[in-house]
Amino acid sequence: MKEENKMEIQLVYIVEGYKFKEYKNAANFEEFIKNKNFKEYELRIIADAFKENLNSEDVEKIVKVGPDSAKMKLVLKGILENLDVDFYANKELAIEQMELIHYGLVNNLKVEYYANPIYTIKQMKAIIYGLINNLKVESYNDHKYTFEQMKELIDGLEKGLNIKILQNEKLTVDEMKQIKSRLMKLKK
């Protein structure tokens, strides 16, 4: 029995050197980049986004954080994961902050407590810690607290202390520790 050679022909649409299997995606890409001056790596990420059938509105979110390719890729990843990337598609955020917000979205944390560029990376991690451990993060998710102060407030919450007296950003870490020590003695 003779084997038949089968030939398959596929149409490929090429725009600016990028290959698309679907005309719609190629046309959307072409329209999106028209009269805009993107760098080569930005075009690659934008092309990848359109190849995933994203609409121009979603691609705009990706471009908004450019020209940083790591930020653009993280926004693309979040969109493909059906996350609300509006929480971190913000040019003011550092990539590490964006990654922490992405982590929170993936893990169903209430990212609205820390999805803000006013928080340092360490402050964000302290808030995430509280969310993961079911602490009352609203007791310390104020950017006026330093990371070290947040740690003291967290410690007080974990020890079951009423931390109201500690919620003063003017207190030094040493003062907070002394107050916590007195509260622990009163608790016994």
Question: Residue spans of the language-model regions?
Answer:
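General marker for long, soluble alpha-helical cores
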Residues: 2-188
